[in-house]
A protein has these predicted regions:
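A secondary-structure boundary/capping signal
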Residues: 22, 42-43, 87, 121, ...
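Short, surface-exposed acidic/glycine-rich loop or hinge patches that mediate macromolecular interfaces
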Residues: 45, 123-126, 196
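Glycine/Thr-rich phosphate-binding loops of Rossmann-like dinucleotide-binding domains
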Residues: 50, 94, 153, 227, ...
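Nucleotide phosphate-binding site architecture
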Residues: 27, 48, 151
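Conserved functional loop/turn residues at catalytic and ligand-binding sites
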Residues: 46, 50, 55, 80, ...
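Core AdoMet radical
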Residues: 55-71, 78-130, 135-171, 188-189, ...
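Auxiliary Fe-S-binding modules of radical SAM enzymes
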Residues: 1-39, 70-74, 104-115, 137-138, ...
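Canonical Radical SAM [4Fe-4S] cluster-binding loop centered on the CxxxCxxC motif
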Residues: 31-68
Length: 278
């Protein structure tokens, strides 16, 4: 691991910050951190949901730390990150408070590190329209909300989520931001394969996302975090990942990242470049 990796880890500990890179056991942590791309996870390290694929623990979260956005921005500035990805656990106990934390961290990063692009990966806020509107109005460079899986598997894989609600989130974010003088925000989503879905179901999800004008799609392999999590149904071949990428590109996505180790934030800066943001 390089110097940037160790500096980021040390700073996160000093500032009492979490990274999804560590909490979700991401396989790309060394590569991303050494290339000055990191994903900070706000609003605690306990999630109010228990998704079947996710390594982040479920529990009763602490009250929202209103100083956290400033500390995240400080870390971004100190590390000289060119592309910062900010996500959070689900906070079904306080959706508007969670949305406000995203608004605040976007503003703080722009104040403390004005050269950094901001990508936010948000929950669905249980479909609360005002929460979504708050984040859209803050104008992150990229607004990401992960669809995660096919509709049939939501009950076992994405407990607490609803497929149609996630589609609506992405569609409304694009529609609402289009009225701004700067034009629509770049929207992004990700899906995990290998949880029991069929190929035709994946292509159906891609069509639903393309119909809602999503710009960036990431496709990665599910890797079971523990025996307590959803079993992996199978490992997709390189040819299958290439096929999925080709099919998605044909549907009109501006950028598709597809491969076994692809995660939401993998090559995030390069994805921004491909859409003309950098």
């Amino acid at each position: 691991m390089g110097e940037t990796f160790h500096n980021l880890k040390k700073l996160a500990r000093e500032l009492n910050l979490h990274t999804v890179c560590e909490s979700a056991h991401c396989p790309n942590i060394g590569e991303c951190w050494n290339h000055k791309t990191a994903t900070f996870m706000m609003l605690g390290n306990l999630c109010t949901r228990r998704c079947g694929f996710c390594a982040v623990p479920k529990g009763k979260p602490e009250p929202i730390d209103h100083e956290e956005p400033s500390r995240v921005a400080y870390a971004v500035a100190q590390l000289g990150l060119k592309h910062a990805v900010i996500t959070s656990v689900n906070r079904d106990d306080n959706n508007l408070g969670a949305a406000q934390a995203f608004v605040n961290v976007i503003a703080e990063i722009r104040r403390q590190s004005p050269g950094t692009q901001v990508e936010v990966l948000t929950p669905d806020f249980q479909g609360v329209p005002e929460a979504r509107r708050m984040v859209v109005a803050a104008r992150p460079e990229i607004l990401n909300h992960n669809i995660e899986t096919v509709p049939r598997l939501y009950r076992v894989a994405k407990s607490g989520g609803r497929y149609e609600r996630s589609l609506e989130f992405l569609a409304e974010a694009k529609r609402e931001s289009s009225a701004h003088e700067l034009g629509p925000i770049v929207t992004k989503t990700g899906i995990i394969v290998g949880m029991g879905e069929e190929m035709h179901e994946l292509l159906g999800v891609f069509r639903d996302l393309a119909d809602r004008k999503v710009d960036i799609l990431t496709i990665g392999q599910y890797l079971r975090p523990s025996r307590d999590h959803l079993p992996m149904s199978r490992f997709y071949t390189p040819d299958e990942f290439a096929f999925l990428k080709h099919e998605a590109q044909q549907m009109g996505f501006r950028h598709v990242e597809s491969g076994p180790l692809v995660r939401s934030s993998y090559h995030a800066h390069e994805q921004a470049q491909s859409t003309g943001l950098a």
